[in-house]
Each structure stands twice: as C-alpha cells, then as structure tokens.
Amino acid sequence: SYKREYEWQQPKNNKIFEQLTADSLKTEGTFAMTLIQDGNQIESKMVQPGILKTYIPKEWAEANGTTPDAYKGFLPLQTLNKVFMYNSTGSAEYKNCWDFVAEGVHPLYMDIDSEIVGKNFLYMLTEDKYAGWLKDAYDALDDTKKAYFKPVIDEMATDAEDLGLGENGAYALAWIKLWVENYNEQTDDGPICNTLVTDSATDQAGLLVYSKLRSVEESAGVSLNNIKVAAYQDGYKGIGGYG
C-alpha cells in the first residue's frame, strides 16, 4: 500500500497551462503532477513544448505487452460529461434541446475557440445518429416553436447537401448555427456554475461540466436547489449534453 501527503490547487479560468509553463522554467519546479481534461490543449501547450511527460505504471505496461518507455500517449483517467442546466428560480422551462437555441435565449458556454472539445461536440451533431435526434426533438415541438426554427432549417438545407450530410443534416446545421450565434461566451465552466446557482440568475441556462456542482457551497443566495439538469426532467427531448 502507498501513503502520500500532498498539497493541491485548482487554477481558475484556464490558467493551468500558463502556471505549468512558468513552473517548468524554474530550476526546481513546484508541481509534481497535474490532471487536465482538455486533450487538445495538453497536446499543443504541454506535450509539444516538452513541458509534460506521461506517467505509465510499470505493472500496467507489462500487463499490456509494452514498457513505460515504449508507450506513447497519455492514460485517460476519467470521462467528464457536459450537460445542459438551467436556473429554476423563475418560470422558464427547458424541455427540449431546441429550447436552448430559442429566441432570446443565450446559454452560458465556454468559448469553442478556447476549448476545442466544445467545437468537436458541434461537429459531432452532424453525424447521422445525432442529427436524427435533433430532427426527432424538433418534431416534438409545438407549432409556434417549429415556425420559428423552420426558416433556419430551410436555409441550411443547401449547406447540408454541399457537405454531404445525411437526410437530417439541415437540422444539425440549424441548431449549430443558432447555438454559435447566441451563446454567452465564458472563460471557464466554474464561473458558469457559480452564476447559475445564484438566486439572481433567474431562467438563465448553460452547458457545463456536471461535476462542477460538487464545488457549490450553500449560502445566502446560492444553492444547488436553484439549478436543474435539463435531461433529468420528465419528458425532456433531444440532446442532453455530451461526454
């Protein structure tokens, strides 16, 4: 068995890369290990410059027919889920993934140019299976909401054909277009969570890492009771998030 005493910290607003880069320039660094969830930025900002090295346990390598020195890449430790959430202190209801791109709705979201996994999510929606889910969710809307989205879907039909997408590709492109044009750009999921759990964030919504809820501390004006996960609500239709 192993026992270790250690100190840890959690940089905010995506500053972890700057902090580790500065630490690597010291004669004797402060940090011995890091856990980062963004594989794209790990590769571009940490691996290519030679700041981080992978740790491969000897026993794991031997069990998989290799050695620590020969293994390339990093071992994934966890899978995180980003889900649609909304502040429930008001009257707004988000029962369909199209509600998050409806008129006047501006969900809080980490900018897709800051976190590439968010951009990958949007690309993913054009795959036939997920585009079909968006079509089914659209079909479940009432006539008023359908009428609002229909012109955008029709507008995207030519692009969907030019891109070689499947029969429901226009629905995916329409949802993506509306999302990108209307989301409220944020620097990190932490501040998004901190906003949504307040009494004052009435009817606001966001797409963020589910685990951020664990760091919420109950206080006057701040509570987990102020936030709901959309996909957990009865009758929810469509995409609930991504992992």
Model-assigned labels for residue ranges:
Residues S1-S44, N194:
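Early extracytoplasmic/lumenal segment of secretory-pathway proteins
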Residues E18-L25, G29-T34, K53-M85, C97-W98, ...:
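A structural signal for short loop-to-beta-strand junctions that line the ligand-binding cleft
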Residues D23-T34, I51, G104-P107, V197-L208:
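Alpha-to-beta junction loops
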Residues L25-G29, M46, L75-T79, F100-E103, ...:
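Extracellular/periplasmic catalytic domains that process cell-envelope and extracellular macromolecules
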Residues D38-G50, P68-K95, D113-Y130, G238-G243:
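Periplasmic solute-binding protein
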Residues A61-T66, Q78-N81, V222-G243:
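Periplasmic-binding protein-like
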Residues S91-L108:
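Hinge/capping helix and adjacent helix->loop/strand transition within the periplasmic-binding protein
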Residues Y130-K228:
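Ligand-binding pocket segment of bilobal, Venus flytrap-like solute-binding proteins
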